[in-house]
Amino acid sequence: MYHIDCRDQLERVFLRLGHAETDEQLQNIISKFLPPVLLKLSSTQEGVRKKVMELLVHLNKRIKSRPKIQLPVETLLVQYQDPAAVSFVTNFTIIYVKMGYPRLPVEKQCELAPTLLTAMEGKPQPQQDSLMHLLIPTLFHMKYPVESSKSASPFNLAEKPKTVQLLLDFMLDVLLMPYGYVLNESQSRQNSSSAQGSSSNSGGGSGIPQPPPGMSFYAAKRVIGDNPWTPEQLEQCKLGIVKFIEAEQVPELEAVLHLVIASSDTRHSVATAADLELKSKQSLIDWNNPAIINKMYKVYLGDIPLKTKEGAVLKPELKRDPVSTRVKLKIVPHLLRSRQAAETFPANIQVVYDGLFGTNTNSKLRTLSLQFVHHICITCPEIKIKPLGPMLLNGLTKLINEYKEDPKLLSMAYSAVGKLSSRMPHLFTKDIALVQQLFEALCKEEPETRLAIQEALSMMVGAYSTLEGAQRTLMEALVASYLIKPEVQVRQVAVKFASTVFPSDHIPSRYLLLLAAGDPREEVHGEAQRVLRCLPGRNRKESTSEQMPSFPEMVYYIQEKASHRMKTPVKYMTGTTVLPFNPAAFGEIVLYLRMCLAHSAGVVPTSQSLADMQDHAPAIGRYIRTLMSSGQTAPSSSNKSGETNPVQIYIGLLQQLLAGVGGLPVMYCLLEAVSVYPEKLATKFVDKTEWIKSLMNSSKEEMRELAALFYSVVVSTVSGNELKSMIEQLIKTTKDNHSPEIQHGSLLALGFTVGRYLAKKKMRMSEQQDLERNADTLPDQEELIQSATETIGSFLDSTSPLLAIAACTALGEIGRNGPLPIPSEGSGFTKLHLVESLLSRIPSSKETNKMKERAIQTLGYFPVGDGDFPHQKLLLQGLMDSVEAKQIELQFTIGEAITSAAIGTSSVAARDAWQVTEEEYTPPAGAKVNDVVPWVLDVILNKHIISPNPHVRQAACIWLLSLVRKLSTHKEVKSHLKEIQSAFVSVLSENDELSQDVASKGLGLVYELGNEQDQQELVSTLVETLMTGKRVKHEVSGETVVFQGGALGKTPDGQGLSTYKELCSLASDLSQPDLVYKFMNLANHHAMWNSRKGAAFGFNVIATRAGEQLAPFLPQLVPRLYRYQFDPNLGIRQAMTSIWNALVTDKSMVDKYLKEILQDLVKNLTSNTWRVRESSCLALNDLLRGRPLDDIIDKLPEIWETLFRVQDDIKESVRKAAELALKTLSKVCVKMCDPAKGAAGQRTIAALLPCLLDKGMMSPVTEVRALSINTLVKISKSAGAMLKPHAPKLIPALLESLSVLEPQVLNYLSLRATEQEKAAMDSARLSAAKSSPMMETINMCLQYLDVSVLGELVPRLCELIRSGVGLGTKGGCASVIVSLTTQCPQDLTPYSGKLMSALLSGLTDRNSVIQKSCAFAMGHLVRTSRDSSTEKLLQKLNGWYMEKEEPIYKTSCALTIHAIGRYSPDVLKNHAKEVLPLAFLGMHEIADEEKSEKEECNLWTEVWQENVPGSFGGIRLYLQELITITQKALQSQSWKMKAQGAIAMASIAKQTSSLVPPYLGMILTALLQGLAGRTWAGKEELLKAIACVVTACSAELEKSVPNQPSTNEILQAVLKECSKENLKYKIVAISCAADVLKATKEDRFQEFSDIVIPLIKKNSLESSGVRTTKNEEENEKEKELQLEYLLGAFESLGKAWPRNAETQRCYRQELCKLMCERLKLSTWKVQLGVLQSMNAFFQGLMLLEEEHADPEALAEILLETCKSITYSLENKTYSSVRTEALSVIELLLKKLEESKQWECLTSECRVLLIESLATMEPDSRPELQEKAALLKKTLENLE
């Protein structure tokens, strides 16, 4: 039976379809019947299903040809999701969803888009694909909320991870799909059929058409779908996807790849949008996230292995191809950002090989791939790069060998090889062929590539430093072969290899470097020289024995190479000379040999300064003697000169080079070699004196001087006549007026020769004590020597400065070695004349400095060689009197000369400097003593050191230092230590820096000289003098000069002594006052000590010794010294830095004493002295940088707090220093809070946060606050999850700071602004707070919260919401709650109730912005709360709304419910019965335009509309609840609420159009109860509601139902209200009563007219009566009200006119008369009302019906009417009045016609009407004209 019914129903549907003629009809039928018809497919009866199929076929034909017909998609989607539906039904349903969805308007598609997503869950893959195909085009048109909150999104995807994944995969395929791609299926079908039986189809899918790059066949097929998109549509789809991702609808992490692929799109719009989005997210994306990187690799490479993880073979149609080159070019730059990408093996190497050698690669991709190789080399960790190395190297070498087109690319490849070698040297060590290949490439490649090869080779050097045996020999040969290549870069790299690959004592490589040192190009020879001249062992403590080749071996090697080269074309020709090497290389060779010689002799090998080299001559001499005596010979190689001793070979090489090219260093080396062992070596040059003379004639002054010395050494080996002739020849050459150069050379040679002769003579005398044997030869020789000396003397007054200086030098050399062979006094050239002449030159401004220096030296030498020198004191006095200002160097020379002259023959100046060192020298036993040191000391101490002239004092100090240094063992010096100390102390307070430094050095020396008792006395005197500032007694007039301003030494506190006071206090603090001397020795910061003169004092050695003695005090010293290095006083800073550099040689010392240093600095940060505070800040700034501070984490809070205090210092420079220290401290702390630091990081955070939050952020100092916040933000970024335990303290503190740190002026402005301005301003303030760094930090913390932290955080948060001060704080709290609901919803559930009750306080905040924020938060919070909490909240809100009269409560209810509806729609649906009735009531709130009620109404309306299935459906659904709430509203004490309830009731009645019991009774009872009592504002709404309900439910009211008011009761109540005095209310009451009477057709006209008619009459009287005394405005208002009443009254009379003959009989005449009177007298508005009432009156007048005829009565009424209506017909002004009058006449004529009562219309009436109608013939409105003419014609016809 049921089946028959089903079929019948289907037949009827068929029939309806057949009858449907228009699209609209068809659409209506489909909308109504399609879903149920589809459900019939689940029928078990074949017949029914068949019928359905028939119907669907018919339907499909009709639908397809009519694209505009809409299908009931929404209903179909609901049906599709029904879990109970059978698959047959769902399969057909989706067909119509697919057909209907694209036809929908775009807005509707957007609305249904979320439903499509929901519908997908658990459905078969093809159907899911179809739904996504429908969804994707819609995304372009979707509107997303501005706030990117997950719960606010239209797609609530957070709970649908599977759907998200499906969607993302599909989107990826859409983005990969190229425009205009066509899937050629036909070909695939043919192929697949033929391939079915064959097993050879091995996964390649030969039967499957080629999918687009990056896609599988299946992916392409599903994107194309049933209705392929056009290119334009596809572009829109792609843009929609980008928009979707932009709106953060899916997790950012998941969508990164999509943006990367979209950014490679061929259409500009898509690529640009994706690029912009990628850029904006750049900082948020973690490129080291394996999930992101693996996805990129997968898309880039496609499915390379055909096996899935489980080992099953991947189906060919699912196999993805690699992406196109265009996409690859976008992916690789992102891989370059990622450390993870570099580590992911094997994908990294696959990408490299694909980019370099793939089939579709291009030069751009190759370049990027090479960059990726660089990236791997730099970032890949050691363990992970090992397996990659060989593959990378193979790839790179292959590229280098095969790819030659692009030089830039090749350059990158070579660079990559270099980087790889520095990471993995073991790969390269064995492969010398690769080096050769690169060297060859360097020779042949393009210039732009060479630089990269050069760089690569330079990096590779390190890989070959461990070569041995054959490999090393091979490398030697390789380097040698490339050192002679024409390309400069090749030679440069070869030098690098020679210097780095081999050890520094490797002879063949040194030889190669020596050859390179002769290279014409600076970059080659400069590098070679740098390596060769690098002094070994200077900075190393270990033995230097293996760091240079041994001298003999090196000499033999060079000799062998030289002799070989002489036989080959590589020899060098210069003039007539042939050299084995070019001059530059040869020069470097001999210098290097000299360095090897020095090294082998055990001294520091230097080649920079000849004077330094000469200091080592005695040691070298000893070594040479050893070599000569050991008889060491060369190996049996060919040796042209036959010399086999290395020294002889060395001298031979020097001779060869000197003869060919010359050069000062070569000359020196030869001179040195011969001078140190003249007896053996000089004799060989006796026969070469002419050659030596030629060297003496050189154009260079220094060369002549050295040659003259050389000549004197050679000559000194001869004697007798040979010597005589040589000296005579020299005298002759000197006197001959040759060129000045020849004279100069001869003059020097003469002096040196005579000097050596005298020295020899003196030595013989002391040795033999036997003068007799040589007596016979003496007179002759003495005469010759005297002649020579006089000859030299004659040149002293030469006009040539050159010759004068030479004469001076020569005389000095003679005087140093023996008594001058000239008279002491008298006329002519005497010793007195000579002394006076030389002394006169010192102050002379005509003389050069060189002349002055030589004159002083010479004077100092006279008493040295002559024990009986008569003018010793004269000479000394002269030297001491010749002080000149600012000639410091000269004073050091004078000091030296005074020292030599004072001690006379015992001076070290008398020694042979080539053979004896200063330390080794002892004066000859028989020398006469001429010591005048006591006298000199007395003159200096008692005359010069206390001179009023500061220059004299400075000079005296330098002389005194010289005396103490050089004569430290002299008894006179030792016995005057206190006086000398006193003298030095007096100079300490000089304003001149050098004077201070000299004095401090002197003090150190004095202390070292004393015995224990002396030292104690010296220390106490010094400390007393320094610390008390007691002046030195003999400095009488010094006071005025000592502290004169402007000199270097002046310190900020105006005391020259401040540096020394600090040193003294430093020593005293250590309880070791004597250490002050050590400090003074170390405080060596004047440049003077680095000069030749200064260095001679040997203070470096003293300083080293002092450093060693101070070592035990380092723990106490290091902290103080560290701080002193940053002292603002320059003098102190330099002195202390000097001491520091001397003491702290080990870099780790600071780390060792870190705690002590820190303790000292923190203590001194708050010192009373600003200088100390500033230096402590600066020192702290330096200390904290770049060192691990794990051990001092506990100290950090103290440092922060102290620096915060100093940041507010009174002195600006201290404040700046503190700011600098704080910035550094901040950076260091941020680094320490990195998760990589582990437990140390945790400890740091725990230590820092309380300090930064309580002290920093709450500081009154702006800078401190700013820095604290900045630091917190950075810490939160770097610390990550480590912040979790501290969140309960950190988050509330930061929330408080949002208000504390806001400028207070904003609060002031907010208070003064209007409501509208205030809201806008507060909104902007809250927005600024939310984007502030503090909020940024809070958001960072929130990521890591969970249940372990919430228990502590929530109570604090609640407290802050309730008692927090300030807009920012409260708004921030709300924002935090919102974030918590999304970050940890499950964990939050137990605490939601507490948070809700806290937020309730915010809901009633007077500030609308805070109120909105709290409502917004509450809207999110209900999602995580328990049902019981939510119910309590809703009850609370309900209570507020119904009971509280303040607008603030109503607003908060609207905002909260709206927020719940928007952000937690599911919660609202679950509690719809509580919420929606309230929303319905809220919708009907009576809006006050000035207030925000209009906005609230809109919010309520939105809640209602979004949660009910149409308003009618909603009312039906919640009728019970709606009535309950409206009843409650009506019973409210508030008039406004009563009125609101009434409006809501009226709305229910209107929209339902009929109410059934018992609801009708409930509503009416409630309304009638509300009517009782006095009139109140808004009571009118009750009346309107009653009228609405009665009108809508009149039929139901006819029935008698218990508890339902009867019609009679309703009328009684309403009529009662009509009698109320309030006219405005009365108008509504009368209108309501009329509506009720009309609806119920009740006859209550008597009562009604008794109320209304008197008022109409009264109104007429008043309006025609006398004006009242009220003011004009009130009058106007009253008139308007009366007019309104009149209109209403007439309208009501018309409506209330009953269908009762008796009543009509009683009132018809009166009513007609009343209307006619008003028609004649009133304004047009009243006339119009009266006419409308008249129309209703005649419409219901029973006299005009045949059965109730009364001709007489009717005639009377008609006459009355016709007389008055003519006024209206003839009203020319208002056409509306004419129109209404015509309708009345038309109605009358019609009624008379129907009742056949024409006779009642008398002729008088007709005439009146015809005349009036005639006036309308020219009417302006044609329709009226026409109607009037028609009626006139009708009337005329009656006659």
Curated annotation (Swiss-Prot):
One Gene Ontology term, aspect cellular component: centrosome
Repeat (HEAT) residue spans along the chain: 28-65, 107-144, 162-205, 326-362, 387-426, 429-466, 469-507, 683-720, 721-759, 783-820, 829-868, 870-907, 931-969, 975-1012, 1013-1050, 1112-1149, 1152-1189, 1194-1231, 1243-1281, 1285-1323, 1348-1386, 1390-1427, 1517-1554, 1558-1595, 1605-1642, 1646-1683, 1779-1822
Protein name: Proteasome adapter and scaffold protein ECM29
Disulfide linkage: none
GO BP terms: ERAD pathway; proteasome assembly
Cellular compartments annotated: Endoplasmic reticulum; Endoplasmic reticulum-Golgi intermediate compartment; Endosome; Cytoplasm, Cytoskeleton, Microtubule organizing center, Centrosome
Oligomeric form and interacting partners: Non-stoichiometric component of the proteasome; associates with the 26S proteasome. Interacts (via N-terminus) with VPS11, VPS26A, VPS36, RAB11FIP4 and RABEP1. Interacts (via C-terminus) with DCTN1, DCTN2, KIF5B, MYH7, MYH10, MYO10 and ARF6.
Keyword Endoplasmic reticulum included in the entry's annotation: yes
Entry GO MF terms: molecular adaptor activity
Function text: Adapter/scaffolding protein that binds to the 26S proteasome, motor proteins and other compartment specific proteins. May couple the proteasome to different compartments including endosome, endoplasmic reticulum and centrosome. May play a role in ERAD and other enhanced proteolysis. Promotes proteasome dissociation under oxidative stress.
Family that this chain belongs to: Belongs to the ECM29 family.
Keywords assigned: Cytoplasm, Cytoplasmic vesicle, Cytoskeleton, Endoplasmic reticulum, Endosome, Isopeptide bond, Nucleus, Phosphoprotein, Proteasome, Repeat, Ubl conjugation
Crosslinked residue numbers (Glycyl lysine isopeptide (Lys-Gly) (interchain with G-Cter in SUMO1)): K1033
Region feature (Disordered): 187-211
Phosphothreonine: residues carrying this PTM: T830
Compositionally biased intervals (Low complexity): 187-201
